[in-house]
């Protein structure tokens, strides 16, 4: 048994040693003459997709390449491309009774024609979310949703799905987060919503909003403020000294007059 095992191991080693030589021999790798003369069309250049999400287009150039590596009969064509069909969410905040429109179209869809696509809308009423389990069908088959006007009950998340009619392939999904606010509930005036420190910062003052410290003037304004402070202080001190001097003079004059009368 030991002898048989030894012979088997030695035979395996010999086979492993000579197998690469057999595989790489010219006879094994011989290429037929017809295959050597074959010509194939390969893509030599392609642009990126025109959009990052949804249906887009790209330019592709292909050429015939032979055994000599020379490119012949090159052609360029415009092809559809789809990088990602989920296009995120757009947020909108409007006032009640304001006319508004949600638009699911894109330039590439307009180029091909919206009649080649199917538009389906769904709504998650009253919340802003991308959880597809919360959406219910919304009766609309147009690429637009128009609110004439919008009411608070129209708030929610609207989902637009775009499919190609030729194969019902989903090529785009876009979410719209819509908030409709009563006019008396909130004032959207930006300036009126600022705090005192924020207003000072808007006017050019150096304000540390993170630690709620007192506002600091810029360098040139600090110098002006310092000069004004020194001037005011000097004026006050000078006025006090003048008053003291006048009081002494008037006091001395009054005393001399009294002595003269005596």
Curated annotation (Swiss-Prot):
GO biological process, one term: sperm-egg recognition
Signal peptide: 1-30
Protein encoded by which gene: Tmem81
Chain ranges on the Cytoplasmic side, renumbered to this chain: 247-262
Assembly and binders: Forms a complex with IZUMO1 and SPACA6 on spermatocyte cell membrane required for fertilization.
Subcellular location: Cell membrane
UniProt xrefs under InterPro entries: Ig-like_dom (IPR007110), Ig-like_dom_sf (IPR036179), TMEM81 (IPR039293)
Protein role: Essential fertilization factor required for male fertility. Part of a conserved trimeric sperm complex with the essential fertilization factors IZUMO1 and SPACA6 which bridges sperm and oocyte membranes during fertilization by binding to IZUMO1R/JUNO on the oocyte.
Residues that carry a glycan: 45, 211
Membrane topology: Single-pass type I membrane protein
Disulfide bond positions: 104-160
Assigned keywords, A-Z: Cell membrane, Disulfide bond, Glycoprotein, Immunoglobulin domain, Membrane, Signal, Transmembrane, Transmembrane helix
Top-level taxon of the source organism: Eukaryota
GO-annotated cellular components: plasma membrane
GO MF annotation list: protein-macromolecule adaptor activity
Topology feature Extracellular, residues: 31-225
Occurrences of domain Ig-like (ranges): 83-171
Source organism: Rattus norvegicus
PANTHER family associated with the record: TRANSMEMBRANE PROTEIN 81
Full protein name: Transmembrane protein 81
Membrane-traversing stretches: 226-246
């Amino acid at each position: 048994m030991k002898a048989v095992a030894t012979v088997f191991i030695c035979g395996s080693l010999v086979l492993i040693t000579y197998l690469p030589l057999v595989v790489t021999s010219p006879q094994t790798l011989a290429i037929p003459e017809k295959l050597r003369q074959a010509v194939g069309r390969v893509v030599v250049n392609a642009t990126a997709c025109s959009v990052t999400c949804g249906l887009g287009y790209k330019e592709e150039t292909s050429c015939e390449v032979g055994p000599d590596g020379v490119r012949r009969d090159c052609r360029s064509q415009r092809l559809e491309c789809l990088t990602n069909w989920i296009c995120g969410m757009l947020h909108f905040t409007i006032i009640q009774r304001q006319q508004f429109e949600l638009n699911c179209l894109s330039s590439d869809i307009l180029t091909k024609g919206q009649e080649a696509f199917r538009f389906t809308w769904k709504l998650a009423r009253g919340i802003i979310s991308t959880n597809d389990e919360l959406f219910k069908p919304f009766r609309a088959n147009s690429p637009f949703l128009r609110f004439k006007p919008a009411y608070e009950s129209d708030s929610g998340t609207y989902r637009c799905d775009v499919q190609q009619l030729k194969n019902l392939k989903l090529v785009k999904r876009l979410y719209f987060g819509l908030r409709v606010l009563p006019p008396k509930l909130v004032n959207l005036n930006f300036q009126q919503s600022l705090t005192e420190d924020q207003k000072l910062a808007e006017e050019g003052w150096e304000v540390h909003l993170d630690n709620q410290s007192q506002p600091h003037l810029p360098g040139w304004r600090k110098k002006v403020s310092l000069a004004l402070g020194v001037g005011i202080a000097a004026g006050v001190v000078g006025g006090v000294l003048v008053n003291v001097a006048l009081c002494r003079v008037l006091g001395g004059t009054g005393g001399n007059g009294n002595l003269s009368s005596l």
